[in-house]
Regions:
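N-terminal accessory beta-strand-rich subdomains and adjacent acidic, glycine-rich linkers
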Residues: 24-190
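Bacterial Sec-dependent N-terminal signal peptides
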Residues: 1-24
Length: 190
């Protein structure tokens, strides 16, 4: 009986890391209108819904730092927090302060973490290094997969250096030319 109990504990201890972190994580905005669904199986990806309508569908993201690709290994831990704090502007604006209000999901990995923030009017993510050594960022990979063919306001250009003096092209996403560059920001009507 004691041997079976010890074998059970050993088996559970070895299996524990692989079953502790959920592969699908959801978080909503403070007003519950925006919902982000994060998948952590093999590669981090996210989907976004607003008022129950899917806006972005399974958008993978990763960051190549040194020789490592962040966002493709196993997530060790997931933490959550809600933030509502006043932020004072250093540079004078129309208002003296604003409220920073969001819900955050943090995916913790060996040498980095990925923070997703869900605001009432949008979402954001960022990669944060937790390692002591500094390595260069070589590449960021992200795709925006819209559920429908929405109208976009896009600054199309044939070069990456730009002074933002051209007109924006207003077209459905699928009508944009595949062989041209676009620079941020791009606005999409949903």
């Amino acid at each position: 009986m004691k041997i079976n109990y010890i074998l059970f504990l050993l088996t559970a201890a070895f299996c524990y890391p692989s079953i502790t972190v959920a592969k699908i994580i959801e978080a909503g905005s403070p007003d519950k209108k925006n919902v982000i669904t994060i998948e952590t199986d093999n590669q981090v990806s996210y989907s976004l819904s607003r008022n129950g309508t899917k806006i972005l569908d399974t958008c993978p993201l990763s960051l190549t730092v040194g020789n490592d690709t962040w966002g493709t290994d196993k997530c060790r831990k997931v933490t959550r927090k809600s933030v509502s704090e006043k932020v004072e502007f250093i540079v004078p604006r129309k208002y003296k302060e604003t409220v920073d209000n969001y819900n955050q999901v943090e995916l913790i990995y060996k040498d980095y973490k990925i923070e997703f923030r869900v605001y009432n009017d949008g979402v954001a993510y960022r990669f944060v290094s937790t390692a002591n050594n500094k390595q260069p960022v070589k590449k960021e990979s992200v795709s925006f997969r819209f559920g429908q063919d929405h109208t976009s306001y896009t600054l199309l250009t044939d070069q990456l250096q730009n002074w933002f003096e051209q007109d924006y092209t207003v077209k459905p996403i699928n009508a944009l030319p595949k062989d041209s560059f676009s620079v941020a920001p791009v606005m999409v009507e949903v």
